[in-house]
Amino acid sequence: MIKTVIDNLCYNFGENMKNDDAIKVLSNELLKGAKMLSTHCSKCGCPLFEKDGKIYCPICEKLKNKETIEKGENEKEIKNEIERKKSEINEILDLNKVVMDKINYLVMKLKEEDEVSRIREIAEAIYVLIKLKKKIE
């Protein structure tokens, strides 16, 4: 009998909640001491409840809470992704700094060097570091 009443009253809660789930939610509200009102929710058609002076639809509230939880999980995933990207950027910046320090060191050595073979070695090392720097930027 109550299932038929619920089927007739709750017409629009969609795929997010089955009739059996709606019955559980509504009966739990009654067990918690809420009073079922004769007015119905404009969104889902289920009866509104009143408890402690607050009038609410337990079906829409349950769906809203589920959406809030999912939204919170998505926000956590986004925050984690941002933190990971920041970490990667910091690593790249650290690597960039190390490469620049090595280039500067080799330039100073190059200024002091007189031997041709050694100048060539240092110049090749600087060239490789510059190519690496361009790749990481």
From Swiss-Prot:
InterPro entries linked to this entry: SSSCA1 (IPR009563), UPF0148 (IPR022954), UPF0148_domain (IPR051888)
Pfam families for this protein: Auto_anti-p27
Family indicated by similarity: Belongs to the UPF0148 family.
Protein name: UPF0148 protein MJ0890
Organism name: Methanocaldococcus jannaschii (strain ATCC 43067 / DSM 2661 / JAL-1 / JCM 10045 / NBRC 100440)
